[in-house]
């Protein structure tokens, strides 16, 4: 079909096509990573994405990480800045990179984590990281 021609290259700050919102494209991404600390990149599940929001009048991005994932939490705890990269199936370059300055971290229950992303497990405890989106 002709669908293949609408491949979107948003990595170079190009705007995604109007038909698909950024949230839809994020949901459609095949994987996501967080780069924190000394450029250490770790793969996190898409369930960690909590979406964009507003806090203190700033645009923020929410991440929820299972407390059992000690590596990811340790890196996030040690970092003031981090970036979240989203990849499409079969692509080694991210189509979207969100640069964040960490504002706060708080513990959330599994139920709260599920509200942010239905893929999370209601029985677990999570850390929620709030990062100001740096343009």
Which residues does each PLM region occupy?
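Basic, polyanion-binding surface patches
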Residues: 1-135
